[in-house]
UniProtKB/Swiss-Prot annotation:
It comes from the Bacteria. It is a multi-pass membrane protein. It comes from Bacillus thuringiensis subsp. konkukian (strain 97-27). It is found in: Cell membrane. This is Fluoride-specific ion channel FluC 1. The chain crosses the membrane at residues 4-24, 37-57, 67-87, 100-120. Na(+) binds at G77, T80. It holds the Pfam family CRCB. The keyword Membrane applies.
């Protein structure tokens, strides 16, 4: 049964990568500026989702642990992209787009922490709500 985790993570990884690719294409349809908005929004969404998943879904045991691992490591891990963030930042610097690079790095780091905090806060709030209503973990 433990070999199933590799399949779950692999399938979730495929779905996360495809979701990132198509969402990126969709954002690029509407955003035609130098600032890499698609990567930023995708990474911020991933920060929120991973924090919420690990704070609420995992602690409530709403899904089997293998599925949670698949979503967190596979889907969210392939949906978000640190390497694209890094390469886009280096490209902005190479093109002397210093202010955009600084804004991008700042928004990515601060925004990622804020979105993780919001995901954690929402998950914690929902967890406490269910516990006060007499639900069990």
């Amino acid at each position: 049964m433990k070999k199933l985790i590799y399949i779950i993570v692999g399938i979730a990884g495929i779905l996360g990568a495809l979701s990132r690719y198509y969402l990126g294409l969709t954002i690029h349809e509407f955003w035609h500026h130098t600032f890499p908005l698609a990567t930023l929004l995708i990474n911020l969404a991933g920060c929120f989702l991973l924090a919420w998943l690990t704070t609420y879904i995992a602690k409530r045991n709403l899904l089997p642990s293998d599925v949670i691992t698949g979503i967190g490591t596979g889907f969210i891990g392939s949906f978000t992209t640190f390497s694209t963030f890094s390469v886009e930042t280096v490209q902005l610097i190479n093109y002397s787009e210093w202010s955009i690079a600084f804004l991008y790095v700042s928004c990515s780091i601060l925004g990622g922490l804020i979105m993780s905090g919001l995901g954690y806060t929402l998950g914690d709030f929902l967890l406490k709500k269910h516990l006060t209503e007499g639900d069990h973990l």
